[in-house]
Curated annotation (Swiss-Prot):
Any Pfam family matching the protein: Response_reg
Protein name as catalogued: Protein-glutamate methylesterase/protein-glutamine glutaminase 2
Molecular function GO labels: phosphorelay response regulator activity; protein-glutamate methylesterase activity; protein-glutamine glutaminase activity
Cell location: Cytoplasm
CDD domains: CheB_Rec, REC_CheB-like
Keyword check for Hydrolase: yes
PANTHER family: PROTEIN-GLUTAMATE METHYLESTERASE/PROTEIN-GLUTAMINE GLUTAMINASE, PROTEIN-GLUTAMATE METHYLESTERASE_PROTEIN-GLUTAMINE GLUTAMINASE
Domain notes: Contains a C-terminal catalytic domain, and an N-terminal region which modulates catalytic activity.
Protein EC: 3.1.1.61, 3.5.1.44
In-chain residues carrying the UniProt-annotated modification 4-aspartylphosphate: 69
The Response regulatory domain, residue ranges: 18-135
Organism phylogeny: Bacteria, Pseudomonadati, Pseudomonadota, Alphaproteobacteria, Rhodobacterales
């Protein structure tokens, strides 16, 4: 089902983005309203403590984007989200406190159409709160511009290939990536080359995401741990929030290293950090794709993989929720092909099976 949010997206591009905050805590509503109001691109047009009040305000105020708490009295956030996504969809950012239960619920919210998920800022974060709120503002602003229409029709059948065991696939994504990855990962065959994923996501939520994908996919899926081997048939998801995921080769095998470091392109884990390490560790035997997301994270790393002789792809604008990261890759000529989301798994598998390699780029000219 295509979702008609063209008018809201156009209005958001033209002026200030209208935000409705839905949370049962008055203190959280006030803190979010104050924080979001510091961004000149955003206008908080209303707040609501529950689903019924939010529904009335959505009808009256026509917000461009909703921030939604999942744990609310009477009607919970997930049930409310599903109800309005069916009848009058609005781009939505889930802002949730992390528990194991809330992590699973957040994944169901993403499947129901939420654009992004943010860990609820701690009101006791002190001096770190302004930086946290800058990230929240940027992601709320980007969410209002996301395309909510999923790809039509069934995704392609898996491609049987004779890919070698030491080949590595890699995917990077941000806004809209949960839905994109949930769609394409199930179509990689069970014994596909090892597959590495960086999805921008808060600390703790990636474990729930990995469990959800493991139930959907032919390959095994789990959250990566330091020292994990990159093996055929296994998808490793970079843990959210605290460290970067890099790959090192030693003794003829590739291993995951979770390393400390400042955010790159405002992101940790960073797609660039993973891609750059892969270019050094396994460059000619890597196929990598940069999927939907805001910003530029991953573009420079994708270019490094292409220059090292690997195969590189990026998601096209029409199938991206936010055409930011793939656009940056296109502008750098980092991707040898720009593909629809549904075409990416087959092209990556065919690249792994092909005897020829993409030409290495000596320059960006």
């Amino acid at each position: 089902m295509k979702v008609g949010n063209t008018l809201m997206a156009a209005r958001a591009r033209e002026g200030r983005t209208r935000v409705l905050i839905v949370d049962d805590s008055a203190m959280v509503r006030q803190a979010l309203a104050l924080g979001l109001s510091t961004d000149p691109r955003l206008e908080v047009v209303g707040t609501a403590s529950g689903a019924e009040a939010a529904r009335a305000q959505m009808a009256a105020l026509k917000p461009d984007v909703v921030t939604l708490d999942l744990e609310m009295p009477q009607m919970d956030g997930l049930t409310f989200l599903r109800s309005y996504m069916e009848s009058a969809p609005v781009p939505t950012v889930v802002i949730s406190s992390l528990t194991r239960t809330s992590g699973e619920t957040a994944m169901r919210a993403m499947e129901a159409g939420a654009v992004d998920i943010i860990s609820k800022p701690s009101l006791g974060a002190g001096q770190g709160l302004p930086a946290i709120m800058r990230d929240v503002c940027a992601r709320v602003w980007a969410a209002a511009r996301a395309r909510l229409a999923p790809p039509d029709g069934a995704a392609p059948a898996p491609v049987a290939t004779g890919a070698s065991e030491d080949w590595i696939h890699a995917l990077g994504a941000s806004t809209g990536g949960v839905q994109a990855l949930s769609r394409i990962l199930p179509f990689f065959p069970a014994q596909s080359p090892g597959l590495l994923v960086v999805q921008h996501m808060p600390e703790g939520f990636t474990a729930a995401f990995a469990r959800r994908l493991d139930a959907l996919c032919r390959m095994r899926v789990r959250e990566a741990a330091d020292g994990d081997l990159v093996l055929p048939g296994l998808v490793l998801i970079a843990p959210g929030g605290l460290r970067h995921m890099e790959i090192e080769r030693a003794g003829g095998v590739c291993r995951v290293r979770l390393v400390a470091g400042a955010p790159v392109s405002y992101s940790r884990p960073s797609v660039d950090r993973m891609f750059l390490s892969l270019a050094a560790a396994a460059g000619p035997r890597v196929s990598a794709a940069l999927l939907t997301g805001m910003g530029r994270d991953g573009a420079a790393g994708l270019l490094a993989i292409r220059r090292a002789g690997g195969r590189t792809f990026a998601q096209d604008e029409g199938s991206s929720a936010v055409f930011g990261m793939p656009l940056a890759a296109r502008d750098l000529r980092a991707a040898e092909e720009i593909l629809t989301l549904d075409d990416i798994p087959a092209r990556m598998m065919l690249a792994a099976a092909a005897d020829t390699r993409a030409p290495s780029l000596a320059s960006n000219d």
